[in-house]
């Protein structure tokens, strides 16, 4: 014998209005769950963006300037120069005067700190290593901060990935489309490595 409850339930399910109510409640539950999930996704994405933007760039070296000759410390440097090298402390030296720890030997007279030799007032230099060394001057921090604020969207993939001043100066001083006037012509064929806010002036056609 079929229980009375089961019989009543079957009779209710046969009525269209009951099916409509069940369908409506299911639809409301589905939409509510979907919206809540979307809200959580948006909230998490916004939180991640805030955390990324709030992480400041490291403007100071991790150890004090002047101790580059101590082997206990390691320096990153500009690597690529055949004749000159700039380390992360701002010293520029001849490649032969580079220590095994990657730092310039500060005891060599030709080693210079924050040297702007070959650089013009607009922040463009004819030698990449001098561009990096000059860019690392503490007085250039505000200039670099202004550039980052303006370039955050246009160069987000490139400049928002840097973690400190040295990485920023390495990236900023590399020749880019800003230094090019035409496909194979630099705006300034001599001073083409720029850390400044603005590209070199266009050459007269």
UniProtKB/Swiss-Prot annotation:
- Transmembrane portions of the chain: 17-35
Record keywords: Lyase included? Answer: no
Q: Which residues lie on this side of the membrane: Cytoplasmic?
A: 1-16
User: InterPro entries from the entry?
Assistant: SPRING1
Q: What membrane topology does this protein have? A: Single-pass membrane protein
Carbohydrate-modified residues: 67
Tell me which Gene Ontology terms the entry assigns under biological process: positive regulation of SREBP signaling pathway
What is the predominant subcellular site recorded for this chain? Golgi
Q: List residues in topological domain: Lumenal.
A: 36-205
Query: Keyword set for this entry?
Result: Glycoprotein, Golgi apparatus, Membrane, Transmembrane, Transmembrane helix
Q: Which Pfam families match?
A: SPRING1
Name a single GO cellular component: Golgi membrane
Places the protein is found: Golgi apparatus membrane
Which family does the record claim for this protein? Belongs to the SPRING family.
> What is the role of the protein in this entry?
Positively regulates hepatic SREBP signaling pathway by modulating the proper localization of SCAP (SREBP cleavage-activating protein) to the endoplasmic reticulum, thereby controlling the level of functional SCAP.
* Name the record gives this protein: SREBP regulating gene protein
Species this chain originates from: Gallus gallus
Species lineage, top-down? Eukaryota, Metazoa, Chordata, Craniata, Vertebrata
């Amino acid at each position: 014998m079929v229980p009375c409850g089961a019989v009543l339930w079957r009779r209710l399910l046969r009525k269209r209005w009951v099916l409509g109510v069940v369908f409506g409640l299911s639809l409301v539950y589905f939409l509510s769950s979907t919206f809540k999930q979307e809200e959580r996704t948006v909230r998490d994405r916004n939180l991640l963006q805030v955390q990324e933007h709030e992480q400041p760039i490291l403007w100071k070296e991790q150890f004090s300037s002047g101790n580059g000759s101590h082997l206990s410390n390691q320096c990153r440097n500009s690597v690529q120069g055949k004749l000159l090298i700039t380390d992360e402390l701002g010293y520029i030296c001849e490649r032969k005067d580079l220590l095994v720890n990657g730092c310039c030997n500060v005891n060599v007279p030709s080693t210079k700190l924050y040297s702007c030799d070959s650089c013009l007032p607009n922040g463009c230099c004819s030698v990449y290593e001098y561009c990096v060394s000059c860019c690392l001057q503490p007085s250039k921090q505000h200039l670099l901060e202004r550039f980052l604020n303006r370039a955050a969207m246009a160069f987000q993939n490139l400049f928002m990935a840097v973690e400190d001043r040295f990485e920023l100066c390495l990236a900023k001083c590399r020749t880019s489309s800003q230094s090019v006037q035409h496909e194979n012509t630099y705006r300034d064929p001599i001073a083409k490595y720029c850390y400044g806010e603005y590209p070199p002036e266009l050459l007269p056609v």
